Structures are given as C-alpha cells and as structure tokens.
Amino acid sequence: MSRVGKKPVTVPSGVTASVEGQTVKVKGPKGQLQFVVHDDVDVKLENGEVTVKPRYETNRARALYGTARAQVANLVEGVTKGFEKKLEITGVGYRATLQGKNLQLALGYSHDVVYTIPEGIAITVPKPTEINIVGIDSQVVGQVAAEIRSYRPPEPYKGKGVRYANEFIFRKEGKKK
C-alpha cells in the first residue's frame, strides 16, 4: 500500500474543492484546476479533506492511488502557491530574451530558437542567462522547462547549455595527448 496515498489532502481556507464522479475540481486565489482520476481509484471529499482509496485490491489500483493523491495535492498547492522552475544558461553568447508572447533563445545555432509561451505560464528573464517559469499547473510548468532545456541540454565537457538551477552536471575530462 502507498504511504503517500493513505494521507488525506487538506483543503485550506480560501480554496474550494469539489468531486464530481472521477473529476476533482479545485478553485483558489490563483486560478482553477481539474484532474480526472483513473477508474480504479475512488475519490471522496469529506470535512474539508480529499481522501483517495483504491477501488479494487489489484496491483494496478494500488499503484495508481498514491499517484492520484499526489496529483490532487499538486492541484491544491498550485491554486494556493503556484509552481516555479528556474533555468540557467551557460555558454559564451548564449542568452534569452522575451519578445511579447515568445521567448527568444540564442544557443549557439546559426539561428535563434523561438519558443511560444503556452497559456497559463508566465516566463520572466531577470538576467540574459536566467529564465524563471511560473504557473499553477505543476505538470505544465515542468513540461515547459523540459522543452526549453531540450533545445540545448548541458554537455559534460564544458557544461555549456540550458540546465535547471539546482542541476549538477557530471563533468568529463577531455581527451589526453
């Protein structure tokens, strides 16, 4: 059994949660999110807490209910605090600029990479080598950060590229003479 799944998700004041069938809807000060839970998982809202339990005693249901509980907890955290990912750009001439709804990245290619910012995501560039991604849906924030990082992932020899702010790059030694 999942230790994460056993804990109920408390709904703080200022946040309203509702369960309609397999859909969990959460509305808070930062916005509104919803998540459709798998059919093998049972979700209930009682006394300001969302509880998640496996509907059947199958391996699949036991595997899914901890994930479903974590998703519901992310919904509640997203509408109250929001999520943020920070990226750092390392390399000579590598930089990022905002142009309206687009993020323009100079990453050493013959052309600039233009990334269109999706709805519900706010990107700021405090320095040309830093990118902050903020949003209420943790899955979308993580996906946007991963897509931007994928344009030039950090390489192990010089460490050039786009990396997460807390990411450690294992450096390799160059070839020897």
UniProtKB/Swiss-Prot annotation:
Q: Which spans are transmembrane here?
A: none
Query: What PROSITE patterns does the entry give?
Result: RIBOSOMAL_L6_1 (PS00525)
Domain of life, per lineage: Bacteria
GO cellular component, alphabetical, reads: cytosolic large ribosomal subunit
Q: Which UniProt keywords apply?
A: Ribonucleoprotein, Ribosomal protein, RNA-binding, rRNA-binding
Annotated GO biological process? cytoplasmic translation
Which cysteines link up through disulfide bonds?
Answer: none
MF term (GO), any = rRNA binding
Record-stated family: Belongs to the universal ribosomal protein uL6 family.
Assembly, per entry: Part of the 50S ribosomal subunit.
Write out the function statement from the record.
This protein binds to the 23S rRNA, and is important in its secondary structure. It is located near the subunit interface in the base of the L7/L12 stalk, and near the tRNA binding site of the peptidyltransferase center.
What name does this protein carry? Large ribosomal subunit protein uL6
Q: Could you tell me which species this protein originates from?
A: Rhodopseudomonas palustris (strain BisA53)
Encoding gene, per UniProt annotation: rplF
